[in-house]
Amino acid sequence: MKLKHLLPLTLATLLLGFGSAEAQTSKPKSQICRIGLEYQMSYNENWGANRPIILSIEPNSPAALAGLKVGDIVESINGRSLKDLSEQEFVEILQGGDAAIQLEVSNFSYKKKSRTLQPECHDRSLLDERLLAQAFAFYSLEDESERAIVYPFDTGREGKTSFENFGNFAFADESKALSSTDIALNEVIRKQLEAKGLRYDASDPDIVIDTYYTLARNPYFDAKKAKNADKLWDVRIDPDQKSLVQVPFLAVGADKQLADYVLTMGIRIFNGRNLSILLWSCEAVEHLTEEFSIEEYARLSIPMMMGQFPFVRYNINPKWRIATHRHNYTGLYLRTSDLGDVAYVVPNSPAAKAGIRANDVIVAINEKPMAMVDQLNAAYRLFVENTLQYRDESTMFTNRNGVKYCRYWRKDSYSSIQKQIAKEKYLSIFSYLFGFRPYILGERSTPYYTFDVLREGVTQRLNVMPELHDNSYITLD
């Protein structure tokens, strides 16, 4: 295996994005700004026709703090209707700098609701801990990676009806006694619809939900093939835990003769005023290598199926992204030219409370010495190369940024990994970003991290209590 195919976004690569602005634009920009949302222009009549739809919101980002939600339709920006703006003009306002942006957004439970979006900006020559965690991701891919998972769903919609004025929903055949499985499915769907802003009202529903499911033997199953197969499982997103779980499902596109069972589950949404009109549907056809609980499948899969209501992006085999971003936060901004140089400390942050100030020089963290950027980068690459034996081959994946052969740590090697990280030659000072993991710092007698800082010629040790920031989210890719 060639190391160049394995390496993550290294610090040197990351710093290229903070280089000379003059080389990138005719008007130099001294700041880089973060908003924390993704959007797509809608070109269907069901939801937000010819307006931007918010697709994802990064937790703890300016977009999240503004109260924006996935599925919001952007009606206006800084007082200008999106009907009068091109997409390019919309983007230029979003990327206009650090000035507050006024948005009006609509969803099921509100119309033209005002939201104030305040971009988070800092000098291009600085790095915060969120970006540092990306640069040093291979210390803990379990906490810093993005993966795409494809689902075997087929989604359809009626093309002309607007869903924007729907307010209430109910379930079909509510007068009949329901099985425990039916009740479980309805509960998952109800939770999803209520989170989108719809209300349950069996007396006057705008839409009516119907479900069906089967678990049957696969008539094309080839036991001999299955016995000789290398892999009879896949991973799926657990939407409750925002993590990946191993399941006895075949990956999309795998040989279906390896599956002993076929599970089919469907959701249909009908017009509550005319039940003959099917507005939206999604069907999952899953090939299983062993029996699996219908209720557990519903818990794992219905949130992903309902992720395309009301705005359909994929008709078949939708791709979901699980973005895992967890790191220790102290509130430091460091200079890209010298990562020991503290440029800014966020007020009331753990670092500020511990007494770290701007213009302090970090000498060491947890007794691991600081070094120059090129030294840190070389030592990090060496660490990645020399610890391949501790990676779990069964967890191999390609990160969303294109890095191949990514693998999580082997759980039976945590002690060995911790010993490697502790070696002086690896200059693993920034492993503190993932210090909440047992394979980083091992057993500790104190929750504090030690920061040795040089101030006015005197080195002093300060104890910092970091905060765990979890900015993980799930979105259609």
Question: PLM features: residue spans?
Answer:
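PDZ/PDZ-like peptide-tail recognition elements
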Residues: A23-S56, E92-I93, L126-E129, R299-P347, ...
